[in-house]
Amino acid sequence: MSQSDLDRQIAQLRNCENITEGEVKALCTKAREILVEESNVQRVDAPVTICGDIHGQFFDLMELFKVGGDCPDTNYLFLGDFVDRGFNSVETFLLLLALKVRYPDRITLIRGNHESRQITQVYGFYDECLRKYGSLNVWRYCTDIFDYLSLAAVIEEKIFCVHGGLSPSIKTMDDIRAIDRKQEVPHDGAMCDLMWSDPDEIEGWNLSPRGAGYLFGGDVVDDFNRKNNIELICRAHQLVMEGYRVMFNEQLVTVWSAPNYCYRCGNVASILELDENLTKQYKIFEAAQENKGLPAKKPIPDYFL
C-alpha cells in the first residue's frame, strides 16, 4: 500500500466517505504489522493529547481535530471505544486506523470495552458494517484488529493511561505486560478489568453494577500509583457531563470526548493536552453542527452509559 493510496483513503474518510472492502482488508493487514510490534503497555512521549471515548460520532471527531490540531501535527493517544452507538463507527475507526498506518509514531490507539466482537454485535458496529458493505467481511477485518490493540499506555513513565481502570489482579505494570492480549475481551480477569472498571468514592474494591470489572477507591489508586511510580491515571469509559473529572487528590482523571453523547445527553466533551513537562491543559468542545439535525438515538439504559 503506497503513501499516496493511504493519503487518498485518509482524504476520503475525512469526508465521511467509505473506502472499498478490498482497501479495508489491505489497511487492516498493514495495521496488524504495526500493532503487533507494540507493547501491552505502550510507551508514549510527551507532548501528547489524550482523547476519551468517541463512539462513532464522526463529525465530533472532526471537531476534536479542529480543537486539538490535525494528526500528525499533534501527537494523539486515544483511549478506546471508537465504535458503537454513534452513526459513523465505520468511518471513525477506519480513519483512526488509516492515520495509525500513515503516522505510526504520532497516534496511539488502545483498546476499550467496545473493541469486542460480542459488544459490537449488540451496540451498532456489526449492523453498520453489514448495512454499509452488504457483508460481514469489514466487521471481521476490524474486529480482528481489535485483538492487536494495546491494553494501556504510559506517558514519560509518569502517566498511566487505560480505557476503564484498575484490577485486583494487577499490582504492577509488569502484570499487564504478562497478559496475552491477542484475544476477544474476556468476561473477567485482568484484561477485562482494565477495560470495564470504574473509580468510585469507596474504600478498596467493590463489584461493578456493569456486570464486568470492578469499582475501585482512592486508596487503591494511591497504592497503584505509589508502587508504579505513577503521578496520574488517565482513563475514559464514563460519561462526564463537564467533559472531564478529576478525583482522588488529582491522582486520577476521566476524559470524555463524545459531546452530546448518543446525540441526546447534552454533555460537553474534552481532550487533555500535555506539554513536554507534562503540564496539563483541558480543552472543552461541543457537538459538531452536522449533528444538529440527527434524530436522537433510542434511549439506552443508564446502566450501560
UniProtKB/Swiss-Prot annotation:
Binding-site residues for Mn(2+) 2, renumbered to this chain: D81, N113, H163, H237
Residues that, per the record, bind Mn(2+) 1: D53, H55, D81
Coiled coil, from the record: none
Catalytic activity: O-phospho-L-seryl-[protein] + H2O = L-seryl-[protein] + phosphate; O-phospho-L-threonyl-[protein] + H2O = L-threonyl-[protein] + phosphate
Enzyme Commission number, as recorded: 3.1.3.16
Gene3D superfamilies with a match to the protein in the record: 3.60.21.10
Keyword Ubl conjugation: no
Active site: H114 (proton donor)
UniProt remark on cofactor binding: Binds 2 manganese ions per subunit.
GO biological process: double-strand break repair via homologous recombination
Record's protein name: Serine/threonine-protein phosphatase PP-X homolog 3
Lineage of source species: Eukaryota, Sar, Alveolata, Ciliophora, Intramacronucleata
